From Swiss-Prot:
Record-level GO cellular component terms: cytoplasm
Stated family: Belongs to the ribonuclease M5 family.
Binding sites annotated in the UniProt record for Mg(2+) 2: D56, D58
Protein name in UniProt: Ribonuclease M5
Origin superkingdom: Bacteria
Residue stretches making up the Toprim domain: 4-87
UniProt cross-references to InterPro entries, sorted A to Z: RNase_M5 (IPR004466), RNase_M5_C (IPR025156), TOPRIM_dom (IPR006171), TOPRIM_RNase_M5-like (IPR034141)
GO molecular function: metal ion binding; ribonuclease M5 activity; rRNA binding
Taxonomic path: Bacteria, Bacillati, Bacillota, Bacilli, Lactobacillales
Length: 190
C-alpha cells in the first residue's frame, strides 16, 4: 500500500514501523514539544501533499495532535485503539511502533478529516452524553474508549469528547448507533 500524504509520527521507531508496513514518507515530531521548524515543515507538507497525523493513543500523542491542528486544521487523522498499541514487553508505553501490520493498514484506510464550521450541524447535547454514560459514571472511561474506536476518532477524556464529536461532525443518530453496537457487544461478553 502506498500512502500519498506525508504521515506525521512521534519518532524514529514509528517511522521504521510505518515504513515496514506501507510505502510512505514521514515527518517526526521528536516528542510532544514540537518546535517551530517542524511545524513549518508539517504546514508545507500539508500544502504540497497533505498530511496524516498518526500519533500514539496516549496523552503525549493527543497533545501533539492538538498542537499540529492549531497550524494545520484540515490535516487528516489516523487513530489506533489503545489495545492494538500495547508493547509486547511489560513496562513500555503505548505506541504506533507496537501495532500489527493489520492495525496500521486499517487505521490508514480509515483516515478521517475534521470538518470546518457547518451551520447545519447540531452539536450533541452534553445531557445525551451523560445519559449514555460517557460523562460521569463507573464505565464512562471504558465507554469513551470503545466509542473512540468505533467512530475512529480516538480516545478522549470527558472534557474533550464534545469537541471531538463536533470536530468530526458526529451526529446524535451516529452516536446512538455506535453506543447501541457497543452496549450490545458488552452485553454479549457477559
Amino acid at each position: 500500500m502506498k500512502v500519498a500524504e506525508i504521515i506525521v509520527v512521534e519518532g524514529k521507531d514509528d517511522t521504521r514501523r510505518i515504513q515496514e508496513v506501507v510505502a510512505a514518507d514521514t515527518i517526526e515530531t521528536i516528542g510532544s514539544a514540537i518546535n517551530d521548524e517542524i511545524l513549518t515543515q508539517i504546514e508545507h507538507a500539508q500544502e504540497t501533499r497533505g498530511v496524516i497525523i498518526f500519533t500514539d493513543p496516549d496523552y503525549s500523542g493527543e497533545k501533539i495532535r492538538k498542537t499540529i491542528m492549531e497550524v494545520v486544521p484540515d490535516a487528516k487523522h489516523a487513530f489506533l485503539s489503545r489495545k492494538v498499541a500495547v508493547p509486547k514487553k511489560n513496562g513500555g508505553s503505548l505506541g504506533v511502533e507496537h501495532a500489527s501490520d493489520e492495525a496500521i493498514i486499517e487505521a490508514l484506510k480509515k483516515v478521517v478529516t475534521p470538518v470546518q464550521a457547518d451551520e447545519d450541524y447540531q452539536e450533541i447535547p452534553r445531557q445525551t452524553l451523560v445519559e449514555y454514560g460517557l460523562i460521569a459514571g463507573a464505565n464512562a472511561k471504558k465507554y469513551r474508549e470503545l466509542l473512540g474506536d468505533d467512530l475512529r476518532i480516538g480516545y478522549t477524556n470527558s472534557k474533550q469528547l464534545v469537541k471531538r464529536l463536533s470536530m468530526f461532525r458526529i451526529t446524535e443518530a451516529e452516536l446512538k448507533e455506535s453506543m447501541t453496537r457497543i452496549l450490545k457487544e458488552l452485553a454479549n461478553e457477559e
